[in-house]
């Protein structure tokens, strides 16, 4: 591995590790709850906005879709990870820094969630946001990394000419 891409690789491992550790902490803390305590580990309420840390599991894709296709989903996820990693590796020098950051975030999130599937058979979600009666589906840090990376990538490709190099 060239030394130029080493910081990207280490960042990828660090972010995936932060995701895994956060999930492990939530799972361990949730095991310590007594049966008579509330189900959430942390809550913050500000007006009509609330933030909860409450463990839940997702056996499908985003928002619990495709739960009946566990093996094909896992194969698809692994193929996406390998494809993105290969693209990042081959095109590293020619990619803009923002594109590398975006792809690193997406890969770290994907690795975090695939690690869950391999360890637990499902993805561990624990972050919950709501406003009034509207509740956003539970998510985790890996999901946040993927979302932020995707938004960065779309924004960068939309507002620059770099997209013409690849598409």
UniProtKB/Swiss-Prot annotation:
Q: Does the keyword Cell inner membrane apply?
A: yes
**What EC number(s) are associated with this protein in UniProt?**
3.4.23.36
Q: Which GO terms describe its biological process?
A: proteolysis
Write out the entry's keywords from A to Z: Aspartyl protease, Cell inner membrane, Cell membrane, Hydrolase, Membrane, Protease, Transmembrane, Transmembrane helix
Catalytic residues per the record? 125, 143
Spell out the Pfam families in the cross-references: Peptidase_A8
| Pathway assigned to this chain's UniProt record | Protein modification; lipoprotein biosynthesis (signal peptide cleavage)
Q: Which reaction does it catalyse?
A: Release of signal peptides from bacterial membrane prolipoproteins. Hydrolyzes -Xaa-Yaa-Zaa-|-(S,diacylglyceryl)Cys-, in which Xaa is hydrophobic (preferably Leu), and Yaa (Ala or Ser) and Zaa (Gly or Ala) have small, neutral side chains
What function is annotated for this protein?
This protein specifically catalyzes the removal of signal peptides from prolipoproteins.
Entry similarity comment: Belongs to the peptidase A8 family.
Q: What is this protein called?
A: Lipoprotein signal peptidase
Origin organism is: Chlamydia trachomatis serovar D (strain ATCC VR-885 / DSM 19411 / UW-3/Cx)
């Amino acid at each position: 591995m060239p030394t130029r891409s080493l910081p990207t690789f280490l960042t990828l491992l660090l972010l995936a590790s932060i995701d895994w550790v956060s999930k492990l902490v939530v799972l361990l803390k949730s095991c310590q709850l007594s049966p008579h305590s509330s189900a959430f580990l942390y809550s913050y309420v500000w007006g009509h906005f609330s933030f909860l840390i409450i463990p839940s599991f997702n056996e499908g894709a985003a928002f619990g879709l495709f739960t009946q296709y566990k093996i094909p989903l896992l194969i698809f996820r692994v193929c996406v990870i390998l494809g993105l990693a290969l693209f990042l590796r081959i095109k590293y020098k020619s990619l803009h820094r923002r594109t590398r950051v975006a792809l690193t975030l997406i890969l770290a999130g994907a690795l975090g969630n695939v690690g869950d599937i391999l360890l637990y058979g499902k993805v561990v979600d624990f972050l919950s946001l709501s406003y009034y009666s509207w509740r956003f589906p539970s998510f985790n840090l890996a999901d946040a990394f993927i979302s932020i990376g995707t938004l960065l990538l779309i924004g960068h490709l939309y507002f620059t000419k770099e997209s013409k190099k690849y598409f």
